[in-house]
Amino acid sequence: MTSNIMKTAPSQGEAQTAPQLFDDWFDPIESAVRDRAREFIEELIRGELDAVLARPRYERGKKVGHEGTPGIMGHRHGSRPRSLIGSFGPIEIAVPRARLNTADGKTTEWKSQSLRAYQRRTLAADALIAGCYLAGTNTRRVRRALSTLFAGAVGKDTVSRVWRKVKSDWDAWNARSLAKEPIVRLILDGTVVRVRLDRKATSISLLVVIGVRADGQKVLLAIKSMGGESTAAWRTVLDDLIRRGLRRPEFLIVDGAPGLETAIAAVWDGVPVQRCTVHKHRNLLAHAPERLHEEITADYNDMIYAATCEEIETRRKAFIRKWRLKHRAIADSLQEAGDRLFSFTRLPPSQWKSARTTNAIERLHEEFKRRIKTQTVLPSADTAAMLFWALLASGQINMRK
């Protein structure tokens, strides 16, 4: 049976009062944060002007107790409104104005150093925009995603300017001199990510180098996107470090990739090289059935974590004797690494823990992949390397000690 009830269009009044998405999503916490942010910024700028004039607002002379404090002669003349967008959202602030006397008897308008002329966004807001773009979101989607937070104040030109700033910082970081870096140790490792090349999803390698300063502080030295971990690829990375002034390191920690070890021998022959003990442990397990994994791990750890060089050597020989009889592939795999698996014993025992593995880079790789796991493919090889750097430079990924 056909219904005779006809749907009528909403009247003009009803249409105007119809609720819109997010209209009733008022958050008193967010509102309070913006109010406090506005108050803090205005107080910061007023304090800056007070310091320049050596007197607070509404006082003609210098503040009591500051009579001898040098200050610039001048006078305030009201304020002007400024719009500012931060990670807290958009706010309106009142920026104080002042005229300052100059040496030639004229006056000039005071300019705040805290809030630069024409500044419309905080650095945190720019970092948020850049992060969205670096993560593979195009300009249109960045604007759409951030329109609610920034009250629609993110235009195409804004995204483009922020992107150019990130690209400029990235280029400067890649070209910076390393001549004054007191690097004594290098940790080198690569990881595989998926990027779009010629409209196809392709696997590439990100080759990462961390430097360890004499005081133990770690610093990211290089990250390059390459087609793989070949000798030529790693040689490109090492040659670039040398070109930028990096001094010959005293110790190297690697994952065991043949291409890397060959490249190292070509540029830094004679420098002690430590094969990552964690990578070698994985290699051993890959050569044995699962039923032997627990026993292999116990014997391996007993050897690697022995307290003295003598104990390590004794347990190494015992490991090889036992596993040559029980499962020869295990003994052969350990012998393949040779003395490079135990190069850490050349260092003081207090440094053994940090010198045995490439864990410092492995943790960065894990955190980076966790950040991009929702994206099956990154936009390009260059963007992949830049995103790794940007996440670390912005503090979104932290390097452990």
Language-model features, listed with the residues they occupy:
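Short, amphipathic alpha-helical "recognition" segments used to contact nucleic acids or chromatin
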Residues: 124-136
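DNA-recognition alpha helix
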Residues: 140-151
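Conserved phosphate/pyrophosphate-binding and hydrolysis machinery centered on Walker-type P-loop NTPases
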Residues: 34-38, 119, 135, 152-156, ...
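Short, conserved DNA-binding cores of transcription-related domains
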Residues: 2-6, 12-108, 112-115
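Acidic/histidine-rich catalytic cores and adjacent linkers
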Residues: 1-24, 47, 51, 55, ...
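RNase H-like nuclease fold core
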Residues: 2, 72, 76-79, 90, ...
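Conserved beta-strand -> loop -> alpha-helix junction used to position metal-binding or nucleic-acid-contacting
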Residues: 251-258, 263-299
